[in-house]
A protein has these predicted regions:
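ATP-binding pocket architecture of kinase catalytic cores
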Residues: 29-144
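N-terminal charged segments
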Residues: 1-36
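An alpha-helical support segment within catalytic cores of ATP-dependent transferases
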Residues: 7-21, 133-189
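Short charge-dense sequence patches
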Residues: 13-25, 71-81, 189
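A general boundary/transition motif marking the beginning of the first structured unit of a protein
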Residues: 3, 7, 116-119, 170
Length: 189
């Protein structure tokens, strides 16, 4: 298992007055491992109050946080999910406050019980079967390959791709080369 410190205690963030009142009395920890581009905090330790997660996105990541809020609202009709406690959107920022789901992450279970990998895979498969059992005709969202590639190309054309963030194998490659190599791997191209 990785020995990365998965979260770090941090000071309370200042937000707008409506949200600040809801967050008074919580201890804060910042997530160190997410890859979404958002800043994520776990809020805990407030007596008689649920553990919460606060996600903040800026710029294009604010759109992703907004999309997550919309999808959570929709998906609650099909399965238990975190409750959205608060959502704030400004032209450049989005803040999403949700309850935490009780339990442990797959990573936490694997750290505690290294021999449980097969059980974790089985549990994830059950969850994915449930998710995939939702009829596609009920889903109002589009995130197919064509849509995502168009988003990626737009980001590339607007200079929003950070080439210094490429993996070791593609370190030093120009963005256009990564784009061309990725297209060679696409199914049905």
């Amino acid at each position: 298992m990785s020995h990365i410190q998965r979260e770090t205690s941090c000071s309370r963030q200042r937000l707008n007055s409506n949200l600040d009142a809801d967050l008074y009395g919580y201890r804060w920890a910042r997530d160190n491992v997410g890859q979404s581009g958002a800043t994520i905090y776990r809020l805990y330790g407030k007596p008689n109050a649920p553990e919460l997660f606060l996600k903040h996105g800026k710029g294009s990541v604010a759109n992703d946080v907004t999309d997550e809020m919309v999808r959570l609202n929709w998906l609650t009709a099909f399965m238990p999910l975190p409750t959205i406690k608060h959502f704030i959107r400004t032209p450049d920022d989005a803040w999403l406050l949700t309850t935490a789901i009780p339990g442990k992450t797959a990573f936490q279970v694997l750290e505690e019980y290294p021999d449980s990998a097969e059980n974790i895979v089985d549990a994830l498969a059950v969850f994915l079967r449930r998710l995939h059992s939702i009829p596609v005709c009920n889903c109002p969202f589009n995130s197919d390959r064509v849509f995502r590639l168009a988003q990626a190309q737009s980001r590339m054309n607007n200079g929003l791709v950070d080439a210094s963030d490429f993996d070791d194998e593609r370190n030093g490659w120009p963005v256009e080369q990564v784009w061309k190599e990725m297209h060679k791997l696409l199914p049905f191209s």
